[in-house]
């Protein structure tokens, strides 16, 4: 017996009953999240009298666009529209809390124009999704916190000027998170401070350092590591001007700020500050845009400026603030292709008697390219991708289609001897461990990043940006295959 399928009827949507229109400023100009790229202009809607008090600039509303309902943000209220006879009414104000200020709405328009995108593509990165339970919470009052510890640093007086637009070159061999935290504490006395960090690990370290100066109530985080509820709650605090210090990742660069606030961008050349989704804005460039168009101070922080920042320094648009320091640097070149030059062994052994030694290597993995040991031809897969080896006992496999090659033989000379080029951190660990036996080895790269290292002598091997924190400092830092740090691979080989 065939079981009959349940009857499904088409939904019938009737025209909603029109409500009386507001007498004062009856038209609202709204950005609508249409999802259509070329429909990026504001649209006019009637404001019902019952929603007139809630329909203000920056309010989140629901409107009918075409035959479906869409979210929108109110830009302004006006008394007329070119299409007065064909306007639809706003359906509802979805949140009693404002999600944008006139300043941020202007910023959304500037960014959309500069990067040739839709304003709502920018808004998706700037404004978190609504949480109804948070909207019902009462606003909490937070007083301005005072510095708990006196500042122990003496930076350039330029850094504490009321008006500033500069690049601060950090001194080497100094914890950057500590320096940035001290800078935040110094600027905190002059007004609101927004810190943009390249990644969550950096953000956590700055928050930890700031805890020595300020109470946690003064610090608000805006990043994807928070829960959906906490992020929306913190965002509303920022919109209400209840946050004195804001910490966030690239999306926080759109946070509403008070007049005269300071934006601090860490690692301004980092790829993490680029938004991968359309329209592809960059947090550093958005901060530069805010500084040029609005009353906002800007400090870019890093060890050396990027080409873009260097150009602004050359044109004197940015002030370059240098840091005087002296670091003992020794450059040594291998003579026979060895990993560590023989002349460096004595320096490293001497440093291991004092504390941990850090080896910075350019790549993760084991052998990132397989070559024939006899003819030195590159081993390729049938799909055209190069072969890699992920361990000493593993067979080569393709980096693109993951096809394994057990019993690999060179297609040119039929030799089965493998030469591993482009050594990764795992291969470095093997060779360094043999060179300096009886010392513990700590690897830090990729998904396995060590937060800190012990104070005892040990070998720490890390890729750039993954180096663990040493509370006593590293006795020596060795950059292996230094030229590789400046090479960017743009192709499959």
Descriptions of predicted regions:
Residues 214-226, 383, 388-390, 437-447:
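Conserved RecA-like helicase motor-core motifs
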Residues 1-335, 350-353, 358, 476-480, ...:
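Accessory, non-ATPase domains that flank or precede helicase/AAA+ motor cores in DNA-metabolism machines
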Residues 200-203, 211, 419-452, 463-464, ...:
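P-loop/Walker A nucleotide phosphate-binding surfaces of NTP-dependent enzymes
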Residues 353-434:
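Cys/His-rich short segments
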Residues 489-493:
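Conserved phosphate-handling catalytic cores of large alpha/beta enzymes
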Residues 347:
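N-terminal cationic and glycine-rich segments that engage phosphates or anionic surfaces
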């Amino acid at each position: 017996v065939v079981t009959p399928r349940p009857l499904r009827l088409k939904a019938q949507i009737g025209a909603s009953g029109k409500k009386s229109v507001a007498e004062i400023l009856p038209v609202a100009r709204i950005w609508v999240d249409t999802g259509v790229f070329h429909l990026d202009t504001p649209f006019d809607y009637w404001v019902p009298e019952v929603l007139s008090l809630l329909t203000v600039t920056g309010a989140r509303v629901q409107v009918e666009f075409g035959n479906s309902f869409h979210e929108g943000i109110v830009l302004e209220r006006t008394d007329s529209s070119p299409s007065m006879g064909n306007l639809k009414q706003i359906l509802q104000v979805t949140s009693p809390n404002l999600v944008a200020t006139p300043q941020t709405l202007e910023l959304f328009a500037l960014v959309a124009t500069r990067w040739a995108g839709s304003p709502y593509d920018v808004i998706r990165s700037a404004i978190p999704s609504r949480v109804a339970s948070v909207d019902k919470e009462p606003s909490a009052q937070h007083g301005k916190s005072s510095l708990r510890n006196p500042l122990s640093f003496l930076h350039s007086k330029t850094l504490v000027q009321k008006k500033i637009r500069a690049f601060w070159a950090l001194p080497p061999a100094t914890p950057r998170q500590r320096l940035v935290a001290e800078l935040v504490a110094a600027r905190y006395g002059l007004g609101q401070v927004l810190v943009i960090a390249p990644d969550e690990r950096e953000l956590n370290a700055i928050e930890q350092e700031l805890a020595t100066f300020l109470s946690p109530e003064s610090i608000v985080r805006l990043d994807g590591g928070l829960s959906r509820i906490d992020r929306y709650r913190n965002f509303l605090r920022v919109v209400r001007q209840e946050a004195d210090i804001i910490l966030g990742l690239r999306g926080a660069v759109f946070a509403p700020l008070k007049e005269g606030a300071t934006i601090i961008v860490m690692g301004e050349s980092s790829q993490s500050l680029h938004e991968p989704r359309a329209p592809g804005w960059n947090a550093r460039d958005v901060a530069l845009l805010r500084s040029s168009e609005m009353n906002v101070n800007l400090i870019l922080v890093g060890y050396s400026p990027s080409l873009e920042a260097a150009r602004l320094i050359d044109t004197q648009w940015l002030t370059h603030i240098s840091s005087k320091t002296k670091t003992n640097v020794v450059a040594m070149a291998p003579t026979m292709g060895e990993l560590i030059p023989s002349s460096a062994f004595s320096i490293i052994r001497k440093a291991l008697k004092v504390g941990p030694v850090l080896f910075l290597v350019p790549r993760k993995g084991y052998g990132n390219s397989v070559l024939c040991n006899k003819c030195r031809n590159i081993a390729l897969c049938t799909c055209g991708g190069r072969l890699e080896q992920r361990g000493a006992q593993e067979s080569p496999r393709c980096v693109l289609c993951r096809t394994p090659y057990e019993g690999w033989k060179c297609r040119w000379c039929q030799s089965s001897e493998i030469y591993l080029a482009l050594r990764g951190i795992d291969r470095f660990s093997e060779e360094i461990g043999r060179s300096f036996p009886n010392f513990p080895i700590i690897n830090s790269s990729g998904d396995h990043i060590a937060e800190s290292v012990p104070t005892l002598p040990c070998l720490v091997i890390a890729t750039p940006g993954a180096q663990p924190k040493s509370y006593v400092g590293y006795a020596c830092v060795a950059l292996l295959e230094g030229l590789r740090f400046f090479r960017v691979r743009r192709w499959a080989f």
